[in-house]
Amino acid sequence: MKNIYPQKKVGLYTPYLDVLGGGEKHILSIIKVFEDLGLALYIFWDKDLKKEIKERLGLTFKNLFFLPNIFKKKSFLSFLKFLLISKNFDYFFYVTDGSYFFSSAKKNFVFAMAPDRNLYRLNFINRLKLLNWQFISNSSFTHKWLKKWGINSYVISPYIEEKFFKLKKQKKETIILSVGRFFGHLHSKRQDLAIKTFKKIKQKNLSFKDFKLILIGGLKKEDRDYFSYLQKIAAGDPSIIFETNLSQEKIYDFYQKTSFFWHFAGFGIDENKNPQNVEHLGIAPLEAMACGCLTFCYKAGGPKILIEDGKTGFLFSTEDELINKMENIIANKKKQNEIKKNAHHFVLTNFSYEVFKQRVKKLIIKI
């Protein structure tokens, strides 16, 4: 692509870069738009992660460089050093961990990945530091909470990969799918409730006797105890299947053949007290909707904003409400097709890469 902004530079620091999860893909995708416009990218991190970023996140950079991580000590000297270095950047992005600093870059952005009050306690000194910064939020839900805390932000939601919108002409199978990392802390995906609800609906209604529950998610060593607990409550039921650390291509294949998608993240949590512990956006439900799965989400956080109950998917507040809605829709093929069509159109209209790219470009023009 033609270099529209010759010699301009973009900087990034995120203390979470070693995670390389959805949040990291989001912020890296944002700066990738800048690279495509001809800008050079610089990340403050001691290790060159281009290979890992390509393998794990599917993002390839041609003009990305890594600089020594001067932030890791969080000393006065390191922040002073950054103040001198940052004048070389036209744009600088920072994923906050609750700390803030002065920057002499021309334009500065705090990227807000979660509506956690502890990350945005802006005392007088922090407000001084942020006089030349603008906030970007990852979802309408995060934006709403930042606004409640007196912070204005510009929403740039992540995008859904183009392949998810290309529906394969294959018959949907008797599968209920849940996708999300296996862990029992913070905003857990609550696969335990999916298992219990699945057992309950199979016992109650013969229409679901041939269904399988497939639980897909990333699994780390430190989360093995929670995973073992899930296997225990599944109690050897052969219709409950666990799939760990699958490639994106294999996950995509499951979406394509799945009939129903369940998402329990945030279940039982009061989002008005702990908004950080419910689903902030809900990428997996959006992927499911794009792939023609009838999607059911716990009524909190991002999904509550995104899904129009009974039109683009379904929301539930209790396990029994989920079961009732499943029973009501299982035999109504006409309604199923109508909802699938609406959901696919909604995601395509609001979460395609083209929509994402234009949001980022508007940010550049805006500033």
Which role fits each region the language model picked out?
Residues 40-99:
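Active-site donor-binding segments of glycosyltransferases and PAPS-dependent sulfotransferases
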Residues 227-252:
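Nucleotide-activated donor-binding/catalytic signature segment of Leloir-type glycosyltransferases, i.e.
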Residues 256-280, 293:
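Acidic donor-binding loop of glycosyltransferase active sites
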Residues 285-297:
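Short hydrophobic beta-strand element within catalytic cores of glycosyltransferases
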Residues 308-310, 314-320, 328-334:
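Conserved acidic donor-binding segment of nucleotide-sugar-dependent glycosyltransferases
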